[in-house]
Amino acid sequence: MIVEKRRFPSPSQHVRLYTICYLSNGLRVKGLLAEPAEPGQYDGFLYLRGGIKSVGMVRPGRIIQFASQGFVVFAPFYRGNQGGEGNEDFAGEDREDAFSAFRLLQQHPNVKKDRIHIFGFSRGGIMGMLTAIEMGGQAASFVSWGGVSDMILTYEERQDLRRMMKRVIGGTPKKVPEEYQWRTPFDQVNKIQAPVLLIHGEKDQNVSIQHSYLLEEKLKQLHKPVETWYYSTFTHYFPPKENRRIVRQLTQWMKNR
């Protein structure tokens, strides 16, 4: 439910931008909405950002990139960010911010209700997994780009994030295993009904490609539709030209689903 909608300066004449304040489990959470300026009915695109706090913040240029392909895009900032209420979590209670954002797109007058896609980058990958599980057949597709799928693996791989993870999650995977398991929903992947696309650079050192391998394997075991675009020379951040090309390709992939 939208509490407030304010115009935000857009560098593109083809896309209108708004900052949105919406309700998520009673909290006022902020996000960025992009609408194509041309009137019409569009697919919805839930953009789930990476990072935490000021790292990996939602960038208007990135949102416009996707909206320009013919989508109404909504990107939640997550609770505790940019004036939003509550404390930021890490694929914990903040999953509700993604669920509520999906429902917000369902209620948008210019969005085709049965054509809402989930996109997650980096930390947004696990947020997308959780949302695809929660929404089941309501989601048209799910794309994870350099996405996290396993929080214990993230803790092991990213020594630089351990302090933050212990603070936000409440301890180490050994101390609070149930908290990490709750945030790593492999046991519920059977509830995903949307076709899945996994995009990953094999040289990614922020989120190792192991995360995509694990999710791919799980989906295949369950005979779920999954496609993979793995790039042997790319890291977590793809070169700009390739990035733009893949944006066009993945949005076309979504529309074909």
UniProtKB/Swiss-Prot annotation:
GO terms for biological process: proteolysis. Pfam families: Peptidase_S9. The active site is at S122 (charge relay system), H236 (charge relay system). It is an enzyme of class 3 (hydrolase). Its EC number is 3.4.21.-. GO terms for molecular function: serine-type endopeptidase activity. Belongs to the peptidase S9B family. PANTHER family: DIPEPTIDYL PEPTIDASE FAMILY MEMBER 6 (PTHR42776:SF27), SERINE PEPTIDASE S9 FAMILY MEMBER (PTHR42776). This is Uncharacterized peptidase YtmA. It comes from Bacillus subtilis (strain 168).
